[in-house]
């Protein structure tokens, strides 16, 4: 019984740290990129025609901190899939492989182009993944 309590306490602590860690990533990336709340809200509403460099760099930061992009702005498909709801993972694998082939010398532009490519086929992702 005591062992179960310790396990539950440890698990609860880990989940709380993960939750706040994700919030810190968003906050840190907003601060680092200087993206406006308005640009983030427009993106969440589906406006992916913005030419906002700060938004693009926010997405790069967000994806790098979550391990989706490496330091060379290359996509780790397996890690990207882990951030999606299970119901979307199978259908997303081919799409991630297609979208990751986008070439761009600027890592911020590349991250934005990959998100745009993905969202064109799965717009519901903007509501499923906590970008804000």
Name these PLM-found stretches.
Residues 3-21:
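Cleavable N-terminal signal peptides of Sec/SRP-targeted secreted and luminal proteins
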Residues 22-40:
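Secreted, propeptide-processed cysteine-rich mini-domains
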Residues 26, 58, 66, 77, ...:
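Disulfide-stabilized extracellular ectodomain repeats and their linkers
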Residues 51-74:
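Short N-proximal segments of mature Sec-exported proteins
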Residues 75-84:
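Amphipathic regulatory helices of Ca2+-sensor modules
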Residues 83-123:
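Compact alpha-helical subdomains of small soluble proteins
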Residues 124-132:
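Short, low-complexity, Pro/Ser/Thr/Gly-rich segments in the mature regions of secreted, periplasmic
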């Amino acid at each position: 019984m005591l062992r179960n309590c310790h396990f539950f306490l440890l698990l609860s602590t880990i989940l709380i740290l993960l939750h706040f860690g994700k919030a810190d990533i968003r906050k840190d990336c907003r601060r680092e990129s200087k993206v406006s709340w308005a640009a983030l809200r427009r993106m969440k509403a589906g406006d992916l025609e913005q030419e906002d460099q700060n938004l693009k760099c926010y997405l790069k930061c967000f994806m790098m901190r979550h391990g989706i992009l490496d330091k060379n702005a290359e996509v780790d498909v397996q890690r990207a899939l882990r951030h999606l709801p299970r119901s979307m993972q199978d259908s997303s694998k081919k799409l991630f492989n297609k979208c990751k082939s986008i070439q761009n010398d600027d890592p911020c532009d590349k991250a934005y182009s990959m998100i745009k490519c993905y969202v064109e086929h799965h717009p519901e992702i903007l509501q499923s993944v906590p970008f804000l």
